[in-house]
Each structure stands twice: as structure tokens, then as C-alpha cells.
């Protein structure tokens, strides 16, 4: 049995061989499609894909597309899937029935991982590879074996998760059955409450191994532990070793414990995709949020019932049309088989929050070992200190030898001078800092913005524990918001700002740190970081810092005004400097 590490390395090597080269027919995906929240995000994604192809960082001869959600009501990843199928048909015509498509859901503005907000979760940098792998390349690498063992259809996945698996030397994952096929990972019951859980047909004749092909009787979406037992989704640990029963976001399950099989990606054959597309065309524009997992997969398998269509506990916004739409999807898909590829030696990781990001990149996590993540990845940097609790992580950055980055912190796409000290558990992204002490648990991310045709810079800063999504309805309630653990109203006093409606961008219905216009606009990256760190320092020291002299933006506005081309040019400048430094270093060694 190959270890996860060996299996993962083989996939990375295989993908590396395909980067920058034309792929043979059937060897790779025909289409790689990424969803976007809106046209602004679509443009940002297209610009980055174009740069990647120019630099030959992706396999060539593949159609790379970005499909934005239509303006208006949020439609969820299920709605995005339906829109994407329509886009595919309009782009490819009748040919789409012979295509193998990878569809990656990456719409949304990553409020829980704001360093991915400007350029997208699928373009999150990883401490791996030269040039640096982003989540897109990792997805393509981890799925590199799939297309050659797949019938035409669509594989649906999310931008912020990682699936690692190992199967026997002569085994492979095949997506060749009619209907839907999903991957399943053994996980604790606690993990099951936040995922989809498969109720499998019992098969006493089955030989248990790393890879099993099973039929799903019923799919449960984020079930309670009580319901997992009630619907017979719970298994007892078998003889295949402790290391296999680890959901990546959890510790290893102890022996003789209970576990469930949880979901990750799923595939639908062309016939099923066409059925969904025809349904979407007949329904017209969507006016409610559809979940690709909760609303599609729960309709599948012989045990599916319409009961879930009335459960709205996992819906962010209950539209009047939602229940009706769920009923229609249930009747459309009922009777469609759900095949399950059980991967007993696999892990599933989620990197969609600041805490998960720091955990996997800086601590001694299983993902770090299995993926070969580095502490210093494609950077000019002094060695970083290590402690039992973890290490710092430096990605695509230039860090002066006199700079100190504490364990537990991540620095990406940044330039740090000799008199900079970064505290523990910080994230510093796309920033230029010449001289300062950044306190522990700080988040700092700089953006290029174009306002009235002028290129400027703004840096968002806040505490790692701050909740950007937490919102209030009225100005009287903004005292409930916190900035770096301090009452937001007190912060406004320190910054000489008044709590008026003008302080917030957007519809004024949801007042939050996300929509608060508190971040200075400056003429350079370094000035921008200095100004934002000044406002943070003032709050920590309870000393005045006059923000009323600055033009101010909210994070929401930064994303509207962002200048993607300038941000990519800045990264390229760092890339060239690192490459030059490495070449010089290699010459000196030889």
C-alpha cells in the first residue's frame, strides 16, 4: 500500500510533466471551468488564467473558462452549476456531450479568508513548487489521473478543499457509471455533522481495501449524530489500520471507534448533466439559493425522500421559491443512481478560513507532511525559527536577513525590510513593510486600487479573531462590532471618525467591518501598510490617530476598485527578483 505522501508526490510529478506542454487527446481535461460571483470577479480570474498560460504554468491545449453568476439573487453553488452547464452548451454546441469537464466553484468574496478576497480562493498561494503552486494547480495535480478513466461528463469540486488519497498499484478511480459518482472519505461523526454523509448499501461479500466501489442508498446533508445512527450511516472500525481513518481536518480516529463516510467532489455523466440543463432552461432565471450537494445529491439513491426539501436549517437565506425549487429538483433526479468511490486511505482538508490556513501552513500538520509543504517556498529569506508548536511560512516573498518572522505566521507576496518584526500567528499578504513591529494575531493585506483613473494602494488590517461577517442593522448597534478585540465605537473615537451612515459602503442594511470605510488610500504600497499599521497601533495603545485626513475605503470598496493587472505586475517583479537571486546563488555555488 503506497503511503499518501508517495501517492501525492507521484501526482505532483505527473502534473509537473504536463505544465506548459500541449496535452494529448484524452490525457487531460477538455475543459476546466471556474465559477465567479460576478463579472468583476470573472475579469480578475480571466486575467490570472491568461498570465498563467503566458508563463506556461498550466497544461496547454485545454479550454479554460470562467463562468460568472448572473446579477441579482444569490443562487448558491447549485445555481452556479446550472448556469455553467448552460454556458458550456452555448460555447461548445453539440460537442459538449463528448467533453470531460472539471467545474471548480470559486464564486464569493472569501470573508473568512480575506487574503483570497481580491484574486480568488482558487488562486490562493501554497508553500509548494517553483514557481509557486496555487490552489488551481494543486487541484489539477490531485485529479491528474481522473480524465483518462472517465466518460464524458462534469466533475464538480470546490476551490478551498484538498483531497489526498492512495490506492493500490494496479487500482485507479473510474468515473464510468451512469448517474452521479461521489468520492467518500472515512471521517469522525463530528466531521460528518458539517459534511454530506453517505448511507451505503450493505455488502457482506465485499473485500475491504483502499478502494471500494459501492452504491449509495441515501445521502444525508450535514446530519445530526442521532440521524447518522438512525439512518444506518455509522460504521465500526475494521481491520485496516488506524492511519486510514483520519478525516484530514480531524485527529486520527482511535481504534474500535465509530466513523462515517463523508463527501468531497462528485461527478455526473453527460445524460444527468443534460437533464439538469434542460430543467434549468425550462425554469428560467433562478430566484433562490441552490446547494449542489444538499439539493442534488439528497435527491439520489433509492432511499431518498422529499423530507429534506422542507428543511431550511442550512440555507443562508430562505427565499419564497426555495421549497418549490427543491421539490422540483427532487422529482427530476429521483431514481438516479449515486455511485460511491470509497477511499479508505484518504484525507480531506479544508482551507477556507484564517485559522485553517495558519494551521496547515505553519503547524506540524499531516497536510504539511503529505503534500511536502515548505517553510520557505520560492523566496529570498533567512531561515525561519521553529518551535514545537510550529514554524513561520514564507511564500513568494523577499525578506531581509535582519527581519524576524515569528512561528505560526505566514508571509506571502511581500517585501519585508531589516527592521521589521512580525509577531506570532499573523498573515502578511502582498505588503511592503520597511520598518515596524507587527503585533501578534494581526492580519495585513494590501491591494492596488484604481480610483478615477489613478493608481493608489490600500491595506486592510484587523485582528485574526475579528469577525468580518458579523453585522448590525443600525448605527446604535455598532458598539457590538470589534476591531482587534476593541469596541468599534471606541476605535472610531481614536481615529477621529464619526459613526454616520457615510462611514459604511453598500446598502447600509448590514453594517460590519467588511463595509466600514476605515482603511487609508495612499500613493505607494509601503505608505499604505504604514498608515494601516498606524491605525492598528493607535487602537492597541489608545492613542489618537487622525484618519479623517485620508481618503478611506472599506474592504468591500477595495474589491470594487482593485487593479488586478497592477497586483500581478507587482508579484511578477518579486518573481523576477527572486529568480535573479537564485540564479546568482547557483552561480556562486558552482
UniProtKB/Swiss-Prot annotation:
Enzyme nomenclature, EC number: 2.7.7.30
Keyword Ligase listed: no
GO annotation, biological process: GDP-L-fucose salvage; L-fucose metabolic process
Catalytic activity: beta-L-fucose 1-phosphate + GTP + H(+) = GDP-beta-L-fucose + diphosphate
Gene Ontology cellular-component terms listed: cytoplasm
InterPro entries assigned to the protein according to its UniProt record, in alphabetical order: Fucose-1-phosphate_GuaTrfase (IPR012120), GDP_fucose_pyrophosphorylase (IPR012887), Trimer_LpxA-like_sf (IPR011004)
SUPFAM superfamilies in alphabetical order: Trimeric LpxA-like enzymes (SSF51161)
Any Pfam family matching the protein: Fucose_pyrophosphorylase
Keyword vocabulary terms for this entry: Cytoplasm, GTP-binding, Nucleotide-binding, Nucleotidyltransferase, Transferase
Domain of life assignment: Eukaryota
Tissue: Expressed at highest levels in brain, moderately in testis, ovary and kidney, and weakly in liver, spleen, heart and lung.
Localization, UniProt: Cytoplasm
GO molecular function, one term: GTP binding
Function: Catalyzes the formation of GDP-L-fucose from GTP and L-fucose-1-phosphate. Functions as a salvage pathway to reutilize L-fucose arising from the turnover of glycoproteins and glycolipids.
Protein name, per record: Fucose-1-phosphate guanylyltransferase
UniProt source species: Mus musculus (Mouse)
